[in-house]
């Protein structure tokens, strides 16, 4: 490929991680592939992974799979290169009959879409391709087309973070509350979200407004916000 087009980006073969939730089963296939890449001097520009969790899985499960993929790269001595999540969604049927198709709609679809991108920052995943943009298709748990909650979340995330500097995401000790810090044209801002359910976050006095994924901003009262999904805290 490079001989024909030296500027082409060569992306490694992707691996689906959903069978590795409990036993790292995907290591069995992808480990030897990484060994082969090493033998050829790592002739790629990026790694690829599909971090679909099982159909009943959540963004937390997806994050665990991403961590397992990163761990395998480290075990194999893989050089640092971009990691692309070239297919992602939630609720996709399988593996096995115990994991039926799940429809994820409304605010949950928006929240999980946004979390997929925010967790990617924490995991060092530089690209995420949510599958797939098309008319409604029952194969996918979250639907992506103009005006759908998932698509709205994509647009909002672009407005919030594109062109800003990502600083760091931190968890509380229980791993139930995430704060992601950015620097934009107006200075520091945060995006906060729970890993499960609804949680209350204490806020810095520098922030006066909390904005949700659907574009509604409200004044912050008593320096606290209670949220079920990603919320932007700003001046």
Regions found by a protein language model. Give the residues of each.
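C-terminal beta-strand-rich structural cap/linker in extracellular carbohydrate-active enzymes
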Residues: 218-235
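Carbohydrate-binding surface patches
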Residues: 171-206, 213-215, 235
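Active-site proximal loops enriched in glycine and acidic residues that flank catalytic Cys/His/Asp
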Residues: 87, 132, 192-194
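Extended non-globular C-terminal regions
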Residues: 51, 209-211
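Detector for glycine-centered tight turns/loop "hinges" at secondary-structure junctions
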Residues: 146, 212-218, 223
């Amino acid at each position: 490929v490079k001989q024909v087009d030296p500027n082409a980006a060569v992306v490694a073969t992707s691996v689906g991680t959903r069978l590795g939730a409990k036993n790292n089963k995907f290591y069995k296939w992808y480990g030897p592939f990484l060994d082969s890449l090493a033998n050829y001097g790592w002739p790629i520009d990026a790694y690829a992974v599909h971090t679909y969790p099982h159909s009943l899985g959540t963004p937390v499960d997806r994050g665990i799979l991403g961590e397992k993929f990163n761990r395998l790269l480290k075990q194999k001595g893989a050089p640092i290169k971009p990691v692309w999540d070239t297919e992602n969604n939630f609720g996709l049927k399988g593996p096995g009959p115990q994991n039926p198709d799940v429809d994820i709609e409304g605010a949950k679809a928006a929240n999980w879409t946004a979390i997929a991108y925010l967790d990617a920052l924490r995991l060092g995943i530089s690209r995420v391709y949510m599958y797939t943009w098309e008319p409604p298709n029952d194969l996918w748990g979250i639907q992506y087309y103009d005006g759908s909650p998932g698509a709205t979340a994509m647009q909002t995330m672009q407005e919030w973070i594109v062109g800003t500097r990502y600083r760091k995401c931190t968890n509380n000790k229980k791993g139930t509350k995430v704060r992601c810090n950015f620097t934009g044209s107006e200075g520091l801002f945060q995006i906060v979200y729970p890993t499960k359910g609804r949680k209350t976050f204490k806020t810095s006095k520098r922030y006066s407004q909390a904005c949700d994924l659907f574009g509604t901003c409200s004044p912050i009262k008593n320096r606290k916000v209670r949220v079920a999904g990603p919320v932007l805290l700003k001046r």
